Amino acid sequence: MKKILFVAFAFAAIAVSAAVSEKVVLWRNGDNGIKSFRIPALCTAPNGDLVVACDARKNNAGDLNVFQPINITLRRSTDGGKTWTKPENSWTWTWNDKEKWSGSDPSFIVDEKAKKIFLFYNVWKWEDTKTWDNNVYRFYVQESSDNGKTWSKPRDISADISFPE
């Protein structure tokens, strides 16, 4: 009996490890003109879909304090990670001669009761490209009520989570 159980568990372990060992590349540095993808976050949506986000760093792997456009890019899987939607930005931050914004460091919270996914991240608005002194570091949230298919506009929550000045 012990041998039968051992063999059954061994086959189960092999089957599980084979199922999870398939490699899927979600982002590759250089894709779509993006030099670096960093800081992934993953969650399971209320319906069981997988949602993943990461930084799409246009020019290099540098952080928010490195002068460059950074967006949060998302993908979704409805089959346990075997296939994924095309990458799309949760929001495309403005980067032009008048305004320069970057978003970075995504994280998720899933509210099972409300059936919502919340996507949190940092945002940097560049006011002065030579020093850090005049630049503004903010915290934003977006939410999805349809398991990550669509997202609300970004909402600045900095005042809600910061100490009063």
Task: Report each predicted region and the residues it spans.
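Sec-dependent N-terminal signal peptides
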Residues: 4-14
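Asp-box/BNR beta-propeller blade signature and adjacent active/binding-site loops
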Residues: 19-165
